Every structure is written in C-alpha cells, then in structure tokens.
C-alpha cells in the first residue's frame, strides 16, 4: 500500500464558494471556444485529411493479412459471396469483441464487405479489390512521413505486424507491449505527446492556470484542490504541474494524483517529488468505480482525467461518484476521445479496459461516446452545465476536453 501524504483532513468541511456563480464555467468557455489554436501548437491540424487515410490503409492491410493467416482469405471471395466467420478454433473467446470490431473496420474503412440488413453480424463480399500491398511496405512508407504521428505508427506496427498471433493467443499482447521497455515507452509517449491528445491537454493546463489564479485572488484561506483520476504514468500530471509552477502558483494549489495501480502511484510519487519538490502534491490509490472515500467527499474544486473514465463498466455510476467528490461549485474536466479511429482498436483493443462497457449495462455499444452522449450522462448525474472544446477543424471533434459544472444549488447526495 502506498502511504498517503494528503493534507485534506477527514471530515474537513469545504470553504465558502468563490462566487454566486462558479468562475470555472466562464474560464472554460473563454479558453476552450477555439480548439484550433491549441491544435496548431500541438501540430494536430490536418490529421484527418493528410494522415488518417494512410493509417486506415495500413490497418486494413494488417487485418486482411491476419484474417488470411487465420483461415479467411478475403481476396479469394467473389462479389456477393457470404463472408464466413473466422474459424472458432483459431480465436479465443476473449477476443471475439475485437473480431466484431475488425469486421466493422473492413466494412467502414475499406468497403471490402457489407453487412446484411436482415442478419446482424453477417457480411457479404463487395466488388472492391483487396489492396495487395504488404503491410510492411505500407509501414515503411508511412514512417517518417508525418513525424509527429510516428509514435502511433510505431506502436500500431508493434501489434499490427503480429495481429494474427495476437488474435489467436499465440502472442501475449500484454507482454509484447509492457514487457518491452521500448514498446512500453511508445504507449506512454502516445498518451502524453500524440498531437490529438496533446492539444486538449494544453487547453486543460490553460484552464487550470487561470482557475487557480482567479481562486487565489479571492481565497487566501485555502488552496485550490485538484484531483486526477487514472493518472497512470503522469503525462497529463506533468504538463499541468509544470504550467502551474511556472505561473508561480505552487503555493496556491494542492494536487492529488491517483490511480488503481500501486506500482504506478509509487513510481509517480518518486518521480514528481523529485521533479517538482515545490508543488503541494499527494499520491493515493483510488478506484473511481467504488464508493468514494469519506475524506474525499465534497473536497475538490476540479477533478481531471485523461482517457480513463470511458474505461469503466458503468459511466453513470462513475460520473455519480465523481460528482460526490466535488465542492458545490466544482467541476470535472475530462480529456476524452469522441470519434472512432480504426487504428485505436488494434492498439488498445487487446486491453481489458477497452471492453469493460459490455459488463456495465449503461447502454453503450462501443467504448467511446460522443460529446452529446457525455453531456446527457453528465446532466443525468447532476452536473448543471456541460461544455466542451470547439473549433472549425475536423480534429477539434476527435479528442475533446469536456467539462461538467456543478451549480451552487446542486446538492451532492
């Protein structure tokens, strides 16, 4: 168990609200109305137009090659032929959800098959020819073409080049990724530096800097309290803490880093105590799917999380737990992917958290949901207002910073 050094005392009552209307809402609106500025800084713009088509072509090649190795050769099927299922003996049950998704990718991205209108899960071969270019050739031609996206391409190749083995179970994907220092770093770097994830994280840092500044100007009796859920290897943490400390607010905030992994929490504590000794940070184990700890109830001004909350069994339960941890004028700010990308299913589709939604009965048919669904669920959980980042670019619709705000009249149950 990792010892906690949190300065919030059990039973401590939250101080008075900042204003009659939370400043967090206006701060969020002001800084997040134009995603494209952050997108340009992070080099995220033009992704869908310039980069994604190459990624989709590579993903299709990985799937076609894997299916061929597992006994389903699409190129041998004639137009109008029924597309058989992969032989059940070749794919263990735990990968059946991913297989269903890969069939959808073949239909939606490659137009190689078309689903039956009368029978769910049944497909027919179309007249679109299978691209004969080997995945290895496509990968080599893509690597270095868009350097800011290479972390995704390298990680995709780690799994995609062995997709047949990963699907059949002959290759242990967890060992492939986490048992290799380079591959594990690729995954961590993707979450921290991939441009489309980086852009909303930049906006999150801006919002928190302004929020802490506004709070400290009128509240000298208590610090601004931030809780991070599912902080993992600390990619978001690092950016936020650095921005706050560079802005001179190291004494004006408390930051609680949490994760469900004892090892990750212990590692983060060593790392951040060394890198940011001036910051008021504490570290704790926290499973947001479980009933909240008593000492955390109604204690935080802002709760943040990056690509974590969707990976819970029941979003409605999780959002309700988040709400209970907030002060009456608090907010939750989530960086969440709101648009499907076919490569993502290969990169994270073998991780158990990607499919937890199937156990929770919260109405989802996929791990990710769009901003409108987030809004509906947040309001159902008791958040009075829900906002999200906007922009003119297609990239602004892909990974969003979504804010749920409590009104002062909301009572936390």
Swiss-Prot record:
GO MF annotation list: methyltransferase activity
Region (Disordered): 1-22
Catalytic EC class: transferase
Positions of the UniProt region annotated as Methyltransferase (CMeT) domain: 148-391
InterPro entries with a match to the protein in the record: Methyltransf_12 (IPR013217), Polyketide_Synthase (IPR050444), SAM-dependent_MTases_sf (IPR029063)
Keywords from the UniProt entry: Antibiotic biosynthesis, Methyltransferase, Transferase
Transferase listed as a keyword: yes
A biological-process GO annotation: methylation
Pathway assignment: Antibiotic biosynthesis
EC number: 2.1.1.-
PANTHER family listed in its UniProt record: POLYKETIDE SYNTHASE 37 (PTHR45681:SF6), POLYKETIDE SYNTHASE 44-RELATED (PTHR45681)
UniProt similarity note: Belongs to the methyltransferase superfamily.
Job description of the protein: Polyketide methyltransferase; part of the gene cluster that mediates the biosynthesis of sordarin and hypoxysordarin, glycoside antibiotics with a unique tetracyclic diterpene aglycone structure. First, the geranylgeranyl diphosphate synthase sdnC constructs GGDP from farnesyl diphosphate and isopentenyl diphosphate. The diterpene cyclase sdnA then catalyzes the cyclization of GGDP to afford cycloaraneosene.
Name of the protein described by the UniProt record: Polyketide methyltransferase sdnL
Gene designation: sdnL
